[in-house]
């Protein structure tokens, strides 16, 4: 299997993912002192993908498809979802529990849920549950979250991506669709992922909030031993009231870092061949979102060393443990005319060679243009049309292009 397909399949498998946008409030039920909420979505799209038929199009880690063109009826960037939450206040504490199930409409040949665990980027727990967490806290001192939920690093990048309601780049798996497309993942930001975590979030103070957490460390290629957690942190400032103000928006800054080691069984061999026995990876990102009377702009960027591209700690190091630098970002502008939102965005994700690494077909850049139209038939139902032009370039000069047309609908409840 080509490297580009392997990465796309891994990402698609994990993308049963992002929390539901606040399109609707959900279905609330009072049960004694508890408030029970059910929410979710169903979506489906027809996607026509025109792939690269050239001869010099091998890009390891490239996200543009090559070979046969394909037509598919599939999920978009979001899978379907059914999210259950329960909340109450007891003994001066706000407490809640959330479980989210994320199926899709496409056939799957995945292994059963009782297989061995794999604590690496883009993985999922059994029984298709992407969210399983509890919270407790109070408005006076903040909230503690324990369980599995979306990460902090690059979270806002994907939640503000207009292709969240659509498809974005279909990628190499469109010929045999996975349950999610790529959107702008790996083409403007690194996937935030869903990770086991213990996270504290401060109270909102005049628009400012902060979150800090310890996370399950992720495997980094052959570096699968961990004696310390992954750390993530985020700061954000929001301004304006969407219900009353013409000008609203937010600014955010996030960071991620972790340390990984080679298994003890590999240490002697690594030492003999000059291969590093431990690696570190850290990254930062920042973004701005501004909305003025229906005209919305998002500017986002990230930089890291040893954090990889597309997914956290994917392609982060070379064969001897050299840490690769990566950076990227996207610009997006949308305008809402009554029920119709029109949007355009461009994003890139770059991956550099490690110091001393030889030139190869390793991906150097994935980038894409997206043109989208999103029409709200009701507050719950949206029709979507997108055109996507994606390109992958390798360090040795090979490149591939993909053009997608996506038409479909998404329903939130």
Report residues per predicted region:
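Outer-membrane beta-barrel "beta-signal"
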Residues: 233, 401-413
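Transmembrane beta-barrel strands of outer-membrane/channel proteins
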Residues: 40-46, 97-101, 148, 212-214, ...
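Detector for outer-membrane/organellar transmembrane beta-barrel domains
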Residues: 233-371
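Outer-envelope beta-barrel architecture signal
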Residues: 32-40, 89-95, 140-144, 206-208, ...
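Transmembrane beta-barrel outer-membrane domains
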Residues: 31-33, 73-79, 125-129, 189-193, ...
């Amino acid at each position: 299997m080509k490297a580009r397909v392997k990465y796309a399949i891994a990402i698609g498998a994990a993308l049963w993912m992002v929390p539901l946008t606040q399109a609707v409030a959900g279905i609330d039920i009072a049960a004694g002192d508890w408030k029970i909420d059910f929410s979710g979505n169903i979506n489906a799209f027809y996607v026509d993908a025109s792939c690269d038929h050239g001869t010099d199009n091998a890009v390891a880690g490239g996200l543009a498809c090559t070979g046969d063109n394909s037509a598919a009826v599939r999920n978009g960037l979001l899978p379907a979802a059914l999210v259950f939450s329960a909340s109450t206040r007891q003994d001066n504490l706000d407490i809640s529990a959330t479980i989210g199930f994320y199926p899709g409409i496409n056939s799957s040949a995945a292994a059963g849920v009782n297989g061995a665990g794999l604590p690496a980027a883009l993985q999922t727990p059994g029984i298709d549950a992407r969210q399983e967490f509890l919270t407790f806290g109070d408005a006076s001192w903040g909230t503690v979250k324990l369980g599995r939920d979306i990460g902090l690093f690059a979270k806002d990048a994907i939640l503000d991506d207009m292709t969240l309601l659509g498809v974005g780049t279909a990628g190499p798996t469109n010929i045999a669709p996975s349950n999610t497309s790529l959107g702008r993942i790996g083409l403007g930001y690194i996937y935030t992922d869903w990770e086991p975590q213990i996270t504290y979030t401060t109270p909102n103070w005049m628009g400012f909030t902060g979150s800090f957490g310890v996370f399950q460390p992720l495997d980094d290629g052959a570096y699968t031993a961990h004696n310390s957690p992954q750390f993530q942190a985020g700061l954000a400032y929001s301004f304006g009231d969407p219900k009353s103000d013409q000008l609203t928006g937010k600014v955010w800054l996030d960071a991620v870092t972790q340390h990984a080691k080679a298994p003890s069984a590999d240490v002697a061999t690594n030492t003999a061949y000059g291969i590093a026995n431990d690696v570190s990876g850290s990254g930062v990102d920042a973004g701005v979102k501004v909305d003025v009377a229906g005209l919305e702009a998002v500017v986002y960027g990230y930089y890291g060393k040893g954090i990889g591209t597309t997914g956290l700690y994917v392609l982060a190091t070379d064969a001897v443990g050299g840490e690769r630098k990566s950076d990227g970002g996207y610009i997006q502008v949308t305008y809402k005319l009554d029920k119709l939102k029109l949007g355009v965005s461009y994003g890139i994700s770059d991956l550099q060679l490690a110091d001393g690494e030889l030139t190869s077909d390793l991906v150097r850049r994935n980038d894409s243009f997206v043109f989208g139209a999103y029409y709200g038939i009701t507050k719950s139902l949206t029709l979507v049309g997108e055109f996507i032009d994606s390109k992958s370039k390798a360090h040795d000069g090979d490149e591939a292009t993909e053009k997608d047309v996506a038409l479909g609908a998404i329903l939130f409840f």
